[in-house]
Amino acid sequence: MDLSVLDRLKWLQQQQMVSPEFLQILGSDGREELKRVESYLGNNNDELQSFRHFPEFGPDYDTTDGCISRTSSFHMEPVKNNGHSRAITLQNKRKPEGKTEKREKKKIKAEDETEPSMKGKSNMSNTETSSEIQKPDYIHVRARRGEATDRHSLAERARREKISKKMKCLQDIVPGCNKVTGKAGMLDEIINYVQSLQQQVEFLSMKLSVINPELECHIDDLSAKQFQAYFTGPPEGDSKQSIMADFRSFPLHQQGSLDYSVINSDHTTSLGAKDHTSSSWETHSQCLYNSLRTDSVSNFFSLK
């Protein structure tokens, strides 16, 4: 490359600006500088020669074919423990000790809390086992359908059978009760029937008191047992015929009650002749209603 005049001048100026020491070094052979280095390290090179005898490999290093084995290790000399290091180790030991103490306290609290609950559970289990042991006083047998094995259930079954029999008897006595289904409806019909009988008896007693007030004293003296004995074994002969004649002579309503309108119309003519027969019939009819009433009521309350 051909340099211009200006480029040459710039290059010369740069070379002139270089330090004079560098120029001196370049101008000299360099012997003086080497002498300075030797004076710094020593004239006889004693220190450098000491490094020549330094072993290439340590005592613990193994050489294999001039190479250092990978398994070799450099052992450091043990360093003496100082007081500061001991304090640090003690602090590190105390920290886990405190943590273990806290854990032990928590475990103790948990055990204290679980002990009463475990005791309660054990008591409940003991009571359950004792109750199970005390319950079966009988030999438990698998019952078939419609049968029972317990004494209480057997007694309850017998009681229900008695109630059903008494209810059937009441159904047979009370008219129109066979059509009703259900015990509640049957009891309602029976109560209504007993109330109607009571009203009829009261009505008959009032009529008898109007016809002949002297009969009240005789009726009070008589008892229900005597009337029942009379109806179970009545006297034969004329008494039965007189009763049937008296029964035909008295007209009846549709409900079975006596029609006293005819008797009151002919009271002046026929009352004197049939006073004894009418009074006997009225007493017998009253006794009949009373006996029916007592039987129905006794059967009703025997169910309870």
Swiss-Prot record:
Residues 82-91, 120-132 have a biased composition (Polar residues). Disruption phenotype: No visible phenotype. Redundant with BEE1 and BEE3. Expressed in stems and flowers. Residues 74-132 are annotated as: Disordered. Gene3D superfamilies: Helix-loop-helix DNA-binding domain (4.10.280.10). Residues 94-103 have a biased composition (Basic and acidic residues). GO terms for cellular component: nucleus. One of its GO terms (biological process) is negative regulation of innate immune response. Disulfide bonds: none annotated. It holds the Pfam family HLH. CDD domains: bHLH_AtBPE_like. One of its GO terms (molecular function) is DNA binding. Induction: Induced by flagellin, jasmonic acid (JA), brassinosteroid and cytokinin, and repressed by abscisic acid. Insensitive to gibberellic acid. It is found in: Nucleus. Residues 147-197 form the bHLH domain. Homodimer. Positive regulator of brassinosteroid signaling. This is Transcription factor BEE 2. It comes from Arabidopsis thaliana (Mouse-ear cress). The gene is BEE2.
